């Protein structure tokens, strides 16, 4: 008896899109929970897992190294930005509007008139903003931004050592500096930063912006160097540095009639190139 020939039938799977595939594969947990229910301690386990999250984040932030640390910090940075935005939106939502949509037509008694339009929060917020703007204008400087200076440009390595000269922990400052009259040098063996005598300045050519006069005034100190707090401590004079000068020669007085002795000024030139310190008085 001849064998019967059977034709093969090819069964094809239905073609799924990426979204349908992800939905079908990602909802298996929910499907299983609907069929069989949850553990009795499921909620407690979830609560404890969430409580441990902050500890794990702290541990990762301290212990991750290299590229993983960089990626983790970027992720945390984005999360914090979103959190701040949500908090800010919530705070703005809670602030009562200064202008109500429609004034109430029903008359109010005398003791409730001050509560009809709650503008306290808005008024307080605007007052704080105005104060900040005034403060920013008060401390505005002629040069708000300056070019950065690298440590290689600022410091020159000084090799020391009795015979080998292999020790290189000392640094010589290559920029002009201000050293106060009461400064006492440390013993040479322990002096880390060397400020050459030829680059020390004691006077500055200060211009008064309103009077339009330039006077040579003694420098009292360095208030802030925009490059680095260390440069402020060392008294380095670079472009944009805020210095304190003795303005008693100008005869400036306060509203109460007292003579102004010290005032801040900002260096506007490059002292290492010009050989002199030019500054504008901050009034």
Curated annotation (Swiss-Prot):
Q: Where in the cell is it found?
A: Nucleus, Nucleolus
Q: Where is this region: Disordered?
A: 31-109
Q: Which UniProt keywords apply?
A: Nucleus, Ribonucleoprotein, Ribosome biogenesis, rRNA processing
Residue ranges crossing the lipid bilayer per the database entry: none
**What is one term from the GO cellular component aspect held by the record?**
preribosome, large subunit precursor
> Main location per UniProt?
nucleus
Which intervals of this chain are the motif Nuclear localization signal 2?
74-81
Q: Which CDD domains does the entry mention? A: NSA2
Q: By its UniProt entry, which Pfam families does this protein fall under?
A: Ribosomal_S8e
What's a single GO BP term from this record? maturation of LSU-rRNA
Q: Which family does it belong to?
A: Belongs to the eukaryotic ribosomal protein eS8 family. Ribosome biogenesis protein NSA2 subfamily.
Role description: Involved in the biogenesis of the 60S ribosomal subunit. May play a part in the quality control of pre-60S particles.
Q: What is this protein called?
A: Ribosome biogenesis protein nsa2
Q: Which organism is it from?
A: Aspergillus fumigatus (strain ATCC MYA-4609 / CBS 101355 / FGSC A1100 / Af293)
């Amino acid at each position: 008896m001849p064998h019967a020939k059977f034709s093969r039938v090819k069964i094809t799977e239905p073609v799924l899109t990426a979204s349908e595939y992800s939905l079908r594969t990602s909802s298996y947990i929910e499907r299983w929970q609907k069929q069989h229910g949850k553990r009795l301690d499921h909620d407690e386990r979830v609560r404890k897992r969430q409580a441990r999250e902050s500890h794990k984040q702290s541990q990762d932030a301290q212990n991750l190294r290299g590229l993983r640390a960089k990626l983790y910090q970027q992720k945390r940075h984005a999360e914090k930005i979103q959190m701040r935005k949500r908090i800010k939106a919530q705070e703005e939502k809670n602030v009562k509007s200064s202008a109500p949509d429609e004034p109430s037509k029903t008359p109010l008694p005398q003791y409730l008139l001050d509560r009809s339009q709650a503008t306290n929060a808005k008024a307080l917020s605007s007052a704080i903003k105005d104060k900040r703007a005034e403060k920013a204008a008060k401390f505005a400087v002629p040069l708000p931004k300056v070019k950065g200076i690298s440590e290689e440009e600022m410091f020159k390595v000084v090799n020391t050592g009795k015979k080998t000269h292999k020790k290189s922990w000392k640094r010589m400052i290559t920029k002009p500096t201000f050293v106060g009259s009461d400064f006492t040098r440390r013993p040479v063996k322990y002096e880390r930063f060397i400020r050459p005598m030829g680059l020390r300045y004691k006077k500055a050519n200060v211009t008064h912006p309103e009077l339009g006069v330039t006077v040579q005034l003694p420098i009292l100190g360095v208030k802030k160097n925009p490059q680095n707090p260390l440069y402020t401590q060392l008294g380095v004079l670079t472009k944009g540095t805020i210095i304190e000068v003795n303005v008693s020669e100008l005869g400036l007085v306060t509203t109460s009639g007292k003579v102004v002795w010290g005032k801040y000024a900002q260096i506007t030139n490059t002292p290492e190139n010009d050989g002199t310190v030019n500054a504008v008085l901050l009034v």
